[in-house]
């Protein structure tokens, strides 16, 4: 099992009533772990106006992961960032002049973020607690363009969600100075 698969199982998997299931609106992540399950993925259609999601389920598979089980930190961190981070252009002022630079926000539980951030080529960041509609979460902000570039460069590899990385690469290109 790869670190990438371990992250999917840890972040999207749940053990319920003797069955282990993984669900996600993006089929890519379900397909990335489908080889670990004896059953085929299916689309769970929702009638309540919410998004449909893909599901893998098995009573014979119990793959709940812990951080101590991680074997491939680069793949694990890549998947955590894909699933729980937001990359955007942060509007702010430099010397009174408006500008927009890349900002990477990584969300999650404190223990997860502490372990993941220790594998980033960036200085230590303070965990910030944020209240959400479903409770409380933590976030790490990376707002230095150099740090964001270094982190994303260090995470490039396979497997990865190519659609997501194409969007992120395009966003990072918007920030490059002309020349």
Annotate each language-model stretch with its function.
Residues 1-179:
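Internal intein/HINT superfamily modules and their associated LAGLIDADG
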């Amino acid at each position: 099992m790869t670190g990438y698969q371990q992250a999917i199982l840890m972040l999207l998997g749940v053990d319920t009533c003797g069955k282990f299931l993984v669900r996600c609106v993006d089929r890519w992540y379900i397909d990335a772990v489908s080889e670990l399950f004896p059953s085929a993925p299916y689309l769970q259609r929702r009638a309540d106006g919410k998004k449909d999601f893909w599901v893998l389920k098995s009573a014979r598979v119990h793959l709940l992961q812990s951080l101590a089980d991680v074997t491939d930190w680069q793949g694990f961190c890549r998947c955590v960032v894909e699933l729980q981070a937001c990359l955007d252009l942060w509007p702010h002022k430099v010397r009174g002049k408006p500008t927009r630079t890349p900002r990477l926000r990584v969300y999650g539980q404190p223990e997860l973020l502490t372990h993941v951030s220790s594998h980033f080529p960036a200085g230590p960041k303070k965990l910030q607690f944020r209240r959400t509609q479903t409770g409380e979460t933590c976030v790490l902000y990376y707002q230095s363009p150099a740090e964001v570039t270094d982190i994303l460069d260090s995470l490039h590899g396979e497997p990865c969600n190519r659609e997501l990385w194409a969007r992120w690469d395009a966003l990072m290109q918007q920030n490059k100075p002309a020349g």
